Swiss-Prot record:
Residues spanning the signal sequence: 1-20
Cofactor(s) this protein requires: Cu cation; lysine tyrosylquinone residue
Post-translational modification: The lysine tyrosylquinone cross-link (LTQ) is generated by condensation of the epsilon-amino group of a lysine with a topaquinone produced by oxidation of tyrosine.
All copies of domain SRCR, residue ranges: 53-154, 183-292, 316-417, 427-536
Originating organism: Danio rerio (Zebrafish)
Residue list for modification 2',4',5'-topaquinone: 680
Family: Belongs to the lysyl oxidase family.
Name of the molecule in the record: Lysyl oxidase homolog 2B
Catalyzed reactions: L-lysyl-[protein] + O2 + H2O = (S)-2-amino-6-oxohexanoyl-[protein] + H2O2 + NH4(+)
Amino-acid positions noted as binding Ca(2+) in the UniProt annotation, renumbered to this chain: 541-542, 713, 715, 718-719
Positions of crosslink type Lysine tyrosylquinone (Lys-Tyr): 644-680
Length: 762
């Protein structure tokens, strides 16, 4: 069997690898694609009007949109009057989906054009076509396009669904409706490559795979196909070899040709061309595409595939996404990173971003800060792209009002198509109470055979767990377990096959992390000491407010006898032990305001029964190491430090409309709610750095929150604030405070120390 990639349609759905693809990963799995019942197109009574349906509109997924109907040579819409889920069910099934999830009134997906073909629709849910439902009559309506109805269908397609164009002679703009599409490698040199970049383009229609005739096939069509499979561009290939191959075998052709403009994010957004006579391609051969992979997915002669994915684009980056190829869009302007407002944000603009970063077309254009809110300026608003720009910065936008009327609640994001690398097949979670948790088991080669085994739990941290959850497509890590009580996935899967794992947290696969080679080291062995994880679709994102730090800094000379609590908590310099009770310590004091801009609440790692009571502060502390305060020399050497070793986490204030959930008083629950912030005032214990022994001069002040990565976040790079400061022996000036990574690399280079919160030893 030859290798293939499969995608469920209409529009792009989900990746699934065939048995043959597993072989190309270097191993095979005893898996057979289930046989599907042959789909039988419904037979409609002769008096039923013949219509075609499609989903349209902006800011939508592949399986949702405004309902549009083609009748008598014209596309039109459906009015929302009397519309119900039963009508949505009929529409979704007519489009080849299993069922309807919901429907939306009042032109949620934008206003359509042309006639309103259906009004006051009454369906029972069992009809085979929308035309069989009761209505005012086709074309009889008193509605406006502000009442256009939309539907959301299930991702799952009807097996064997066959598109039947009953209006072939009258329609030239019908969207393509097929079960699946794939790139099937033909040449031996491409059959073992991952990802598959070259081969026949085939569609699955009526349960059978068919080639497409290259008659009238264009580079724009190839551009769309490559984008769907996660590739930013296409290239020419050796046509002579494929013509020789086609002559040796008799292809089975699809009934239609395809017309794409090159702007489409998916093949299903292209339109049908002419119909082939007798399903033959007399003057041509099967369509072949050859795609160019992005840098993160391209093999190199010396190192093979890149071990970790890093955004290296100078003008655009993604932040806050759970997997490679998704995130909040940030652009660099005037040396400072900022976000894009979601006004007019659509798939065209999102696709430009995705291709610019080395991915394919966009699966989704996200709005409303769905992947967390950014900080700093909003650089672009009302972005309009043609779809062929090299960078989103080349698109037109409203230059007069970059951020006018926009807040970070409107930050735009993207989800891009990425190549299927097969990483999910080399890892699994076993024994969990749900698919999001379990013992980590990896597939490795031992003595010429492929075996499942465990990962040593010693030294297992949140960073390794983050890679596991990303590799499995399960979001973010919520817990990393060094000791587990999960059942094994198989009787013989108890042996430790990987140890010494150390990840930076950005890798696409656990095998890309540093780990012991052939000689393992796991003193406690596997079993209950095997590594485990629990994953979550969302995560918090803590961000410090640099302006608060800059505006609240001052010096205080405080006598030692007033610092007993601080001394017990080790918040003073080591020389304080020799300081007489009446002698002062010089303290650099400041306030810090920690915002949760993520998608879920920030909660302490340890359970409340393990919180520590502090008599000095009269409340429980839930995290022993939550923040590091450091004073650095201009070359990055630490000259003083302040550890507010114990913290009580609570909601000090919240954005409008958000209620506080956490407070320290009365043994209350602790944490920071999404949209709230925890303020540590300058006048509380340990909210300082002891600079008694520091000489006058120029320094860098640095704050890092969640420094040990004890709690998973969607973005660790924004957990640091840096400031320039000048100390003359009596006064201190704090200036240029900013979040790490918020400026260009050239600017960050002038601030030694941590560029972001990625520590060097990992």
């Amino acid at each position: 069997m030859l290798a293939l990639w499969s995608i469920s349609f209409v529009l792009l759905c989900s990746w699934r690898l065939s048995y043959a693809q597993y072989e190309h990963l270097g191993f095979a799995i005893a898996y057979q694609e289930p046989e599907q019942d042959l789909y039988t197109p419904p037979e409609l009574p002769a008096d039923t009007p013949r219509i075609q349906l499609r989903l349209a509109g902006e800011k939508r997924k592949h399986n949702e949109g405004r309902v549009e109907v083609f009748y008598e040579g014209e596309w039109g819409t459906v009015c929302d009057d009397d519309f119900t889920i039963h009508a949505a069910q009929v529409i979704c099934r007519e489009l080849g989906y299993f069922e309807a999830i919901s429907w939306s009134p009042s032109s949620k997906y934008g206003k359509g054009e042309g006639r309103i073909w259906f009004d006051n629709v009454h369906c029972k849910g069992k009809e085979k076509s929308l035309a069989q439902c009761e209505s005012n009559g086709i074309g009889v309506s008193d509605c406006k396009h502000s009442e256009d109805v939309g539907v959301v269908c299930s991702d799952k397609r009807i097996p064997g669904f066959k598109f039947v164009n009953t209006l072939t002679n009258n329609i030239n703009s019908l969207n393509i409706q097929v079960e699946d599409v794939r790139i099937r490698p033909i040449l031996a040199s491409y059959r073992k490559r991952i990802p598959v970049t070259e081969g026949y383009v085939e569609v699955k229609d009526g349960g059978k795979w068919k080639q497409i005739c290259d008659d009238e096939w264009t580079q724009m069509n190839s551009r769309v196909i490559c984008g769907m499979f996660g590739f930013p561009g296409q290239k020419r290939y050796n046509t002579r070899v494929y013509k020789m191959f086609a002559r040796r075998r008799k292809p089975s052709y699809w009934d239609y040709t395809i017309n794409c403009t090159g702007k489409e994010a998916h093949l299903s957004s292209c339109t049908l061309g002419h119909t082939l006579s007798n399903s033959t391609c007399e003057e041509g051969t099967p369509v072949v595409v050859s795609c160019i992979p992005g840098r993160a997915f391209a093999p190199t002669p010396m190192t093979g595939y890149k071990k970790a994915f890093r955004q290296e684009q100078p003008l655009v980056r993604l932040r806050g996404g759970a997997v490679v190829g998704e995130g909040r869009v940030e652009v660099l302007k005037n040396g400072e990173w900022g976000t894009i407002c979601d006004d007019n944000w659509n798939l065209l603009a999102a696709t430009v971003v995705c291709r610019e970063l080395g991915f394919g077309s966009a699966k989704e254009a996200l709005s409303g800060g769905q992947l967390g809110q950014g900080m700093g300026p909003v650089h672009m608003n009302e972005v309009q792209c043609s779809g062929f720009e090299k960078s989103v910065t080349e698109c037109s936008f409203n230059m007069e009002k970059d951020s006018e009327g926009c807040s970070h609640e409107e930050d735009a994001g993207v989800k891009c198509n990425v190549p299927a690398m097969g990483f999910q097949q080399r890892l699994r979670l076993s024994g969990g109470r749900n698919p999001f948790e379990g013992r980590v088991e990896v597939l490795v080669e031992r003595n010429g055979s492929l075996v499942w085994g465990t990962v040593c739990g010693e030294g297992w941290t949140t960073m390794e767990a983050m890679v596991v959850c990303r590799q499995l497509g399960l979001g973010f890590a919520s817990n990393a377990f060094q000791e587990t009580w999960y059942w094994p996935g198989a009787v013989n899967a108890d042996a430790v096959v990987m140890s010494g794992v150390r990840c930076a947290g950005t890798e696409m696969s656990l095998s890309h992390c540093l780990h012991h080679g052939e000689y393992l080291s796991c003193p406690k062995g596997g079993g209950r000491f095997a590594a485990g994880v629990s994953c979550s679709e969302t995560a918090p994102d803590l961000v410090l407010n640099p302006q608060v730090v800059e505006q609240t800094t001052y010096l205080e000379d405080r006598p030692m006898f007033m610092l007993q609590c601080a001394y017990e908590e080790n918040c003073l310099a080591s020389t304080s032990s020799a300081t007489p009770a009446n002698s002062p310590r010089r303290l650099l004091r400041f306030s810090s305001q920690i915002h949760n801009n993520g998608q879920s609440d920030f909660r302490p790692k340890i359970s409340r029964e393990n919180w520590v009571w502090h008599d000095c502060h009269r409340h429980y502390h839930s995290m022993e190491v939550f923040t590091h305060y450091d004073l650095l020399s201009t070359n990055g050497t630490k000259v003083a430090e302040g550890h507010k070793a114990s913290f009580c986490l609570e909601d000090s204030e919240c954005d409008e409309g958000i209620e506080k959930r956490y407070e320290c008083a009365n043994f209350g629950e602790q944490g920071i709610t999404v949209g709230c912030w925890d303020t540590y005032r300058h006048d509380i214990d340990c909210q300082w750095v002891d600079i008694t022994d520091v000489k006058p001069g120029d320094y860098i002040f640095q704050i890092v929150i969640n420094p040990n990565y004890e709690v998973a976040e969607s973005d660790y790079t924004n957990n640091i604030v840096k400031c320039r400061c000048r100390y003359d022996g009596h006064r201190i000036w704090m200036y240029n405070c900013h979040i790490g990574g918020s400026f260009s690399a050239e600017t960050e280079d002038t601030f030694p120390g941590l560029i972001n919160n990625q520590v060097t030893h990992r």
